[in-house]
C-alpha cells in the first residue's frame, strides 16, 4: 500500500452501495454473525469497523487509522479515507443509513469501489449497529462535515455541518450489555490484532489509545516505609477533574511483512541474516511473502487472505508449501548437498525452524466455513506456486551461502525424522506389549465413548494414586507422570519421542502427532492437566501445554484441553463441614463469613495450605477437583496462533533475556494467559 493517499478517481458513492437484505435476524441470532456473545464476539465488533478503515487503506485512500477504547466503555474508530457516502441512495434514504441499517449493504459488492477487501464491508458495520445501544457516525466528504446517530439501530436524522476540505469517517459504538456476556474490551487483544493489520499493510499507521486507565487504577511503587498523609478533599476533587491517564501504542511498519518476520524471530536465533522477501501479481490476485529460518525446531507459518487471518491455511499455503519443497529438493540435488540415491526431503524437514508470513489479496475470495479461516480458491494455489517457484529459485541461486545453511538444516531434520520414525515404531511395539495397547500406568475408564470420557494427566505418582482411588472410573481415566517431561521447545523430535512420559501421553490419547495426527482417533474428549498449584506445578503444566501446542495443536483448537484448579486451602470448622478455598481472597472471604455466622475455626490446624496434590486424600481430590458438579476447569483456548507461538518461544526457548523481560512485565498480572 502506498503511504500516500490515492486520488479518488474511482467513484465510491451512493450508486456503489448494493443492498441484499435487512437487519431483522441479527439481534435474534447474533452468534450467526459474530461467532459468539462472549468476549470473542465482543471484540469482533471492533474488527468489523477496523476492517472498513483498513479497506480504505488497501484501496490507497487512507494512511492513518485511530482506535480509541473510550472511558465510558465505547469504542471509536477513525480513518482519513474517502468517508462513507451520504448522498441519497436509490432506495430513497441517505446512503450512510443504508450502510448502517441494512445487512449485506456495502461497497464491497461493487468492484469499482473496492477491487480487494477483507470480507463484505457494509455487512459488518450494520451488524455492529444492530448489537449496540448507540452508534454515532461523523463523516467528512463532499465538502462538508456530516453526522448521524443511531439509537437502538434506528437513525435519528443525518445532519450537515461545517464546510471542510478533509475526508474521512469516524464511528463510535457502545455494545449492548443485554446481548453480550461482557462489554469490557481487553487492551492486549485489540493491540495484537491492530499490530497484525499494520504489518500486513506496509506504511499504514494505526494508533491505539485506552482512555479507561483512571487515577484509581494507577498503583505507585512503595519506595519507603512511611505512608503518605491522606489527601484532602480539595486534592481529591482536583484529581477527579484532571485528565485521565491513558495508555497508547502506535503501529507503523515501513517494511511490512519483513518487519513481521523480524518480530516473529526476535526471540529466536536466525540461521541466515537476510530475510527472503518477494511478491507477485496476477489477474485478480496478489501475493507477498517474507520468510527466514531460525535454529529452532518448530514451524511458524502464518497465512492471510485480504488481511483476514486464515488459521486453517488453504490454497495459498498449499501453493507455497509445494513450491518450497520442490525448489529446495532440486537445489540440494543440483548442488550435491543431497546425494542422488538419498530420498527427497519432506516438506516438514524443510519447514523446520521456518518463520514465514504469506499474504494474498484476492478479488473474489472463497472462504470455507463461517469463520473465514481457510481460503478455498483453487486458482490461488497455482498462482502462488508459480510465483514462489520463480522467486525462491532466484533467491537460492543468488544466496549460495545462506542456501547451504538452510539445506543442511533440512538434511539434519530428515535424519532426526528417520530416527523419530524408529522411536515411533518403538512406542507402538512397546504399547502392543501393554494390555490393550495402552501405557501400563494408565488407569483407563470403563466408558468406550470418547465424548463422555476424560483423561486426567496428573503430576506425580502419589497424586496419581489418590486420583485413581477418588475418580469415577466410569468416565475418568488417570495417567500419572513421574517428574518433568522433556521441554519440546529445546529438543528435536527424535529426542522428544524417546521420552517415556511423552510416549505415554501420545499412546494414551491415540491421535498420533504432526502429519500423522487424526483427531477422529482421540480417546478422550476432555484432557485435564492436573498439577500442584505452586511454581513447579505451573512449570509442568506449561511443559505439557508446549507439547500439545507443538505436536497436537488441533486438540487445543477444538477445545479438548483443560487445566484443573485444585484448592490452595482447607478451612476446618468445629462442628461443621470443611470448606475449600482456591485463592487467598476466597480464603479470607470464607473465614470472615464463617466467623460472622458464629462458626469456630480449629485452633491448631484450622487453615491447611496444600503444598501439593499428594497431600489430598482420594475423597478430598474428588470433592474439590474432579467432581463435575463442583470442580473448576479452565479451558485452554487458542485465539491467536502467532501470539501463542511467541509466548511458548519466550517461556520455553533459549532466549533468557526475553523470558526475564516477559516475566518482569507480567509479574503483577495474575490473570491466566489464554494461549
Curated annotation (Swiss-Prot):
Binding site for ATP: 12, 52, 79, 83, 107-108, 114, 120-125, 169, 370-372
SMART domains: HATPase_c, TOP2c
SUPFAM superfamilies to which the protein is assigned, alphabetical: ATPase domain of HSP90 chaperone/DNA topoisomerase II/histidine kinase, Ribosomal protein S5 domain 2-like, Type II DNA topoisomerase
Site label Interaction with DNA, positions: 484, 487
Enzyme Commission numbers on file: 5.6.2.2
Organism, as annotated: Mycobacterium tuberculosis (strain ATCC 25618 / H37Rv)
The protein's name in its UniProt record: DNA gyrase subunit B
Mutagenesis or variant effect for residue 169 to A: Increased resistance to pyrrolamides and novobiocin, however genome not sequenced
Summary of activators and inhibitors of this protein: DNA supercoiling inhibited by (fluoro)quinoline antibiotics such as sparfloxacin and levofloxacin, which usually act on GyrA subunit. DNA supercoiling inhibited by the coumarin antibiotic novobiocin which acts on GyrB. Quinolones lead to gyrase-mediated dsDNA cleavage while preventing reclosure. DNA supercoiling activity inhibited by aminopyrazinamide and pyrrolamide derivatives, probably via effects on the GyrB subunit. DNA relaxation inhibited by ATP and its analogs.
Assembly behavior: Heterotetramer, composed of two GyrA and two GyrB chains. In the heterotetramer, GyrA contains the active site tyrosine that forms a transient covalent intermediate with DNA, while GyrB binds cofactors and catalyzes ATP hydrolysis.
Subcellular location: Cytoplasm
A Pfam family per the record: DNA_gyraseB_C
Coiled-coil annotated residue ranges, if any: none
Record key words, sorted: Antibiotic resistance, ATP-binding, Cytoplasm, DNA-binding, Isomerase, Magnesium, Metal-binding, Nucleotide-binding, Topoisomerase
Function in brief: A type II topoisomerase that negatively supercoils closed circular double-stranded (ds) DNA in an ATP-dependent manner to maintain chromosomes in an underwound state, while in the absence of ATP it relaxes supercoiled dsDNA. Also catalyzes the interconversion of other topological isomers of dsDNA rings, including catenanes. Gyrase from M.tuberculosis has higher decatenation than supercoiling activity compared to E.coli; as M.tuberculosis only has 1 type II topoisomerase, gyrase has to fulfill the decatenation function of topoisomerase IV as well.
Free-text remark on how the cofactor is bound: Mg(2+) required for DNA supercoiling, DNA relaxation, DNA cleavage and DNA decatenation, Mn(2+) substitutes for relaxation but not supercoiling or cleavage activity. Ca(2+) does not substitute for supercoiling activity.
Amino acid at each position: 500500500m502506498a503511504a500516500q493517499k490515492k486520488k479518488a478517481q474511482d467513484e465510491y458513492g451512493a450508486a456503489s452501495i448494493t443492498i441484499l437484505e435487512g437487519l431483522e435476524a441479527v439481534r435474534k441470532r447474533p452468534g450467526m454473525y459474530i461467532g459468539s456473545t462472549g468476549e470473542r464476539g465482543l471484540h469482533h465488533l471492533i474488527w468489523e469497523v477496523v476492517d472498513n478503515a483498513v479497506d480504505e487503506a488497501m484501496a490507497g485512500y487512507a494512511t492513518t487509522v485511530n482506535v480509541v477504547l473510550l472511558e465510558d466503555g465505547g469504542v471509536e474508530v477513525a480513518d482519513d479515507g474517502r468517508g462513507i457516502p451520504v448522498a441519497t441512495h436509490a432506495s430513497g434514504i441517505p446512503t450512510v443509513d443504508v450502510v448502517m441499517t441494512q445487512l449485506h449493504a456495502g461497497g464491497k459488492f461493487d468492484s469499482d469501489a473496492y477491487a480487494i477487501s477483507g470480507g463484505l464491508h457494509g455487512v459488518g458495520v450494520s451488524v455492529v449497529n444492530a448489537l449496540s445501544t448507540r452508534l454515532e457516525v461523523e463523516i467528512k466528504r463532499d465538502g462538508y462535515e456530516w453526522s448521524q446517530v443511531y439509537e437502538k439501530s434506528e437513525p435519528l436524522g443525518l445532519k450537515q455541518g461545517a464546510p471542510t476540505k478533509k475526508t474521512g469517517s469516524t464511528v463510535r459504538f457502545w455494545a449492548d450489555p443485554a446481548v453480550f456476556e461482557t462489554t469490557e474490551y481487553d487492551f492486549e487483544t485489540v493491540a495484537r490484532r491492530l499490530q497484525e493489520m499494520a504489518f500486513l499493510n506496509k506504511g499504514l499507521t494505526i494508533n491505539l489509545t485506552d482512555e479507561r486507565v483512571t487515577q484509581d487504577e494507577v498503583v505507585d511503587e512503595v519506595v519507603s516505609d512511611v505512608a503518605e498523609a491522606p489527601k484532602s478533599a480539595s486534592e481529591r476533587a482536583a484529581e477527579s477533574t484532571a485528565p485521565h491517564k491513558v495508555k497508547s501504542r502506535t503501529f507503523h511498519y515501513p517494511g511490512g511483512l519483513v518487519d513481521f518476520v523480524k518480530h516473529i524471530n526476535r526471540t529466536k536465533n536466525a540461521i541466515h541474516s537476510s530475510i527472503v522477501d518477494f511478491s507477485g501479481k496476477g489477474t485478480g490476485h496478489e501475493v507477498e511473502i517474507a520468510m527466514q529460518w531460525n535454529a529452532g525446531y518448530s514451524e511458524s507459518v502464518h497465512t492471510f487472505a485480504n488481511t483476514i487471518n486464515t488459521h486453517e491455511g488453504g490454497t495459498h499455503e498449499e501453493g507455497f508449501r509445494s513450491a518450497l519443497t520442490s525448489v529446495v529438493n532440486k537445489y540440494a540435488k543440483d548442488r550435491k548437498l543431497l546425494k542422488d540415491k538419498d530420498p527427497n526431503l519432506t516438506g516438514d524437514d524443510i519447514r523446520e525452524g521456518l518463520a514465514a508470513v504469506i499474504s494474498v489479496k484476492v478479488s473474489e475470495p472463497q472462504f470455507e466455513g463461517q469463520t473465514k479461516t481457510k481460503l478455498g480458491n483453487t486458482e490461488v494455489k497455482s498462482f502462488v506456486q508459480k510465483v514462489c517457484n520463480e522467486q525462491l529459485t532466484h533467491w537460492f541461486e543468488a544466496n549460495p551461502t545462506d542456501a547451504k545453511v538452510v539445506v543442511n538444516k533440512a538434511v539434519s531434520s530428515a535424519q532426526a525424522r528417520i530416527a523419530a520414525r524408529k522411536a515411533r515404531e518403538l512406542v507402538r511395539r512397546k504399547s502392543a506389549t501393554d494390555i490393550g495397547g495402552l501405557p501400563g500406568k494408565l488407569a483407563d475408564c470403563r466408558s468406550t465413548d470418547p465424548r463422555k470420557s476424560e483423561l486426567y494427566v496428573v503430576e506425580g505418582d502419589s497424586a496419581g494414586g489418590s486420583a485413581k482411588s477418588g475418580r469415577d472410573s466410569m468416565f475418568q481415566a488417570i495417567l500419572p507422570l513421574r517428574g518433568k517431561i522433556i521441554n519440546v521447545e529445546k529438543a528435536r523430535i527424535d529426542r522428544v519421542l524417546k521420552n517415556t512420559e511423552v510416549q505415554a501421553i501420545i499412546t494414551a490419547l491415540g491421535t498420533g502427532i504432526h502429519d500423522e495426527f487424526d483427531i477422529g482417533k482421540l480417546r478422550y474428549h476432555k484432557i485435564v492437566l492436573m498439577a500442584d498449584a505452586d511454581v513447579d506445578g505451573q512449570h509442568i503444566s506449561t511443559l505439557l501445554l508446549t507439547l500439545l501446542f507443538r505436536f497436537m495443536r488441533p486438540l487445543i483448537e477444538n477445545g479438548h484441553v483443560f487445566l484443573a484448579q485444585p484448592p490452595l486451602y482447607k478451612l476446618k470448622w468445629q462442628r461443621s463441614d470443611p470448606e475449600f478455598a482456591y485463592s487467598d481472597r476466597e480464603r479470607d472471604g470464607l473465614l470472615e463469613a464463617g466467623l460472622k455466622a458464629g462458626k469456630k475455626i480449629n485452633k491448631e490446624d484450622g487453615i491447611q495450605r496444600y503444598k501439593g496434590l499428594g497431600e489430598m486424600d482420594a475423597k478430598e481430590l474428588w470433592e474439590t477437583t474432579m467432581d463435575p458438579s463442583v470442580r473448576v476447569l479452565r479451558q485452554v483456548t487458542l485465539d491467536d496462533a502467532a501470539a501463542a507461538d511467541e509466548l511458548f518461544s519466550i517461556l520455553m526457548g533459549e532466549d533468557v533475556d526475553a523470558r526475564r523481560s516477559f516475566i518482569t512485565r507480567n509479574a503483577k498480572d495474575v490473570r491466566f494467559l489464554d494461549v
